[in-house]
Regions:
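Short acidic linear motifs
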Residues: 1-142
Length: 142
């Protein structure tokens, strides 16, 4: 029993250290899942994916308000903060950087990197946890 408790505590301390860092600073291949402690990585990634979608929703609402007031899309997300639509630009919870915003003539693209930290939409792959927690793809609201 003592060995089991010792192993469990070692695993707990290892996971606590792993999750104490922001996602983009973690060594993604270094996560150790064991029978002693539940799989926290999957829960953490789901939380971060929903946080990404929520932050993109805030940006989307600010873009729509800007469009209603100026009859055009903002040239960049920085224009939303300088005009008071956002207090500060939301940050992608996976990469720690800003979301990708690409306006075109009548609409725009908005997305963040997924758990694989690849923020390129060129691949056309949307993140889906069905493909594994740390699977490729961007997280796109629209």
């Amino acid at each position: 029993m003592q060995k089991y408790l010792s192993d469990a505590m070692g695993t707990y301390e290892s996971q606590a250290h792993y999750f104490s860092k922001p996602y983009f600073e973690r060594e993604l291949g270094n996560y150790q899942q064991t029978d002693y402690v539940p799989d926290l990585l999957t829960a953490d990634i789901r939380y971060l994916a929903e946080t990404s979608r929520l932050r993109q929703t805030v940006i989307d609402l600010a873009v729509q308000a800007f469009r209603n007031d100026y009859s055009r899309l903002p040239a960049s997300l920085a224009e939303l903060t300088s005009n008071g639509y956002l207090v500060k630009e939301p940050v992608d919870p996976f990469s720690g950087k800003g979301f990708t915003y690409q306006p075109n003539s009548d609409d725009y693209e908005l997305y963040g990197s997924g758990p694989d930290l690849n923020s390129s939409a060129d691949s056309g792959v949307e993140y889906s946890p069905v493909n594994g927690s740390v699977s490729p793809g961007v997280i796109r609201l629209r």
